[in-house]
Amino acid sequence: MAMAAAKGRVLPLLAVAAALAAALLYRAPFSKSLGGEGCSLLPHDHFWIASERVVTLGRVGPAAVEVKGGLINAIAVGDYRSFLLRRPVVDYGDAVIMPGLIDVHAHLDEPGRAEWEGFSTGTRAAAAGGITTLVDMPLNSYPSTVSEETLKLKLDAAKDKLHVDVGFWGGLVPENALNPSALESLLNAGVLGLKSFMCPSGINDFPMTNSTHIEEGLVTLAKYKRPLLIHAERIPDVQNEDGIDGELDPKAYTTYLKSRPPAWEEAAIKDLQRAMKDTEIGGRSEGAHIHIVHLSDAKTSLGLLKDAKQNGARVSVETCPHYLAFSAEEVPDGDTRFKCAPPIRDSTNRDNLWEALLDGHIDMLSSDHSPSAPDLKLMEEGNFLRAWGGISSLQFVLPVTWSHGKKYGISLNQLASWWSERPAMLAGLKKKGAVLPGYRADIVVWKPEAQFHLDDSHPVYHKHRNISAYLGKQLSGKILSTFVGGNLVFAEDKHAKAACGAPILAK
C-alpha cells in the first residue's frame, strides 16, 4: 500500500518535471553556443519551429512548422505541444512566425559603388530586418545593369557575399528599348523584369525613357510575362506657379517639396495611359505588367491608376514605409537624410496612402533602400536641392511598417500580403512568399510588442548608419530570427558567418 502511494506521488512529480523541462526547452530555444562557421546558426537541417502566432493559410494561430532540406515540409495547425518529442524543436512562445519579407526595390550599389552599400552589408542588414529576398535595382551600381554583359558583372560581384537571396531587375533605357534582340538577351540572361525612369535618374549611364520606349519595351516583356517597373515622375510641359523660386532657401524642406510637386507624378501616369491600355486583354502587349514604384501622390495619380485597374489594365502599385511613417511637416529643415524622390508629402497625403493600402488600391510595400556615401547627403551643408536623394532603410522596414500601421488597424495577414505574398507574385518567385508546405523555408520570427529605441547603441548593419532618417526613433517589432532556405542566418543579434544566400535568375 505504501509503495502504491509513493508510486502515485512519483508519477505526478515526473509529469511536472517533464512539463517543466518542456517549458525550459521552449522558452530558451537557443543555447549559449549559438553560432558556427557555416551557413546556419543552428546545427540542424531538419527541425520544427513553433509559436502561438503563425501566419499561414490565411489565418494567425498556434502551429508548428517542419523545416527539412531548406523547405517547409509540413505544418501542424493547433496545439503544437504534442510535437515536443519531435526533436529538435524551437518554440518561440507568442512571437510571430510569418513569411520572410521580399523587398522588390533595393539598391545595393555593387559593382562600382560599393562605398555606398554593397552586397555584403546590404544583405546583412536585410537579414537583421527579417528580409529573406531582395531584388536589386539596375542602377546606382556601375555599370548599370542594361545588358547581358553587365548582368554578368553584377553576378560576379555578388559571389560569396549574399546573406539572403537576391534577384535582379534589368534596365530599360533608350539604347535597348527599341532593340528587341538586346532586350531578349538581357531577359534570357535571367533578370526578373525591367525598370525605367520617366525623369532624369541622377545616374549618367541610366538615361530616362519616354512613352514610346516604354510601349515598345512592353511588347518584348509580354513574351516573357515579366513586369516593367516605372519611376513615374515627369516634368510637366507647363509648370504651374507653385514651382520653386530661385530665392527660396535650399535648406528648407518646403523648397524641395515644391521642386517635385504631385503634378510630376500625375504627368507621368497620364503619359502611361496608352501603355497601360496595351496590357489589357487583347492589347498590343497583353501579358506584360506595369508596376509603379514608390507612389507618393495619394490623390490624382492614385485615382488615375485605380481607373486603369478597373478598366482591365495589368497594373500594380507600391509605396514605401518612409511615405507612411513621415510627413512633410515633421521633416526638419536641413536634415537631408529625409530627401527622396518622389518626396515625402504632407500628413493628409500620408493618411490617404494608408487608406489606399488598406483598401487594396496600393498593392504592396518596398523599401526603396537607396543609400550613398555620407558626403553625398550633404548633411552638414543641409542643401536639399543638391544632396543625394534616397532613404537608407533595409533593416527597419518591418518595425517601421508595424509601428506606424498599428493606429490604422493593420493585421498580421495584411503585413504578410504587402511584404511577402504580393511581391513574390510580382517578381515571379514561385514557392516563396508564404508559410506553406513545399515552399522555401524563408521565415521571419519577430515580437510585435517589443519596443526598442534606435539610438547610438542599437546595432545597425548598413554600411553607413548615420545617413538613415530612422535613427533616434522609437519602434515596435523586434526581429528575433531570420531563416533563409532553412538556414538560421540571423538570431540574437548574430549573423551566420558564411554568406549562403542564392542569386535568383528567371528561367
Curated annotation (Swiss-Prot):
Keywords: Hydrolase, Metal-binding, Purine metabolism, Zinc
Pfam families for this protein: ALN_composite, Amidohydro_1
EC number annotated for this UniProt entry: 3.5.2.5
Chain residues that bind Zn(2+) 1: H105, H107, K195, D368
A single BP term in Gene Ontology: purine nucleobase catabolic process
PTM statement from Swiss-Prot or TrEMBL: Carboxylation allows a single lysine to coordinate two zinc ions.
Organism expressing this protein natively: Oryza sativa subsp. japonica
Subunit record text: Homotetramer.
Cofactor mode of binding and number, as noted: Binds 2 Zn(2+) ions per subunit.
Required co-factors: Zn(2+)
Catalytic reaction annotation: (S)-allantoin + H2O = allantoate + H(+)
Pathway of action: Nitrogen metabolism; (S)-allantoin degradation; allantoate from (S)-allantoin: step 1/1
Protein name, UniProt field: Probable allantoinase
Residue positions where N6-carboxylysine is found in the record: K195
Keyword Zinc listed: yes
Gene Ontology MF: a single term: zinc ion binding
Protein function: Catalyzes the conversion of allantoin (5-ureidohydantoin) to allantoate by hydrolytic cleavage of the five-member hydantoin ring. Catalyzes the first step of the ureide allantoin degradation followed by the sequential activity of AAH, UGLYAH and UAH which allows a complete purine breakdown without the intermediate generation of urea.
Family recorded in the similarity comment: Belongs to the metallo-dependent hydrolases superfamily. Allantoinase family.
Binding sites annotated in the UniProt record for Zn(2+) 2: K195, H231, H294
Any one Gene Ontology cellular component term annotated for this protein: cytoplasm
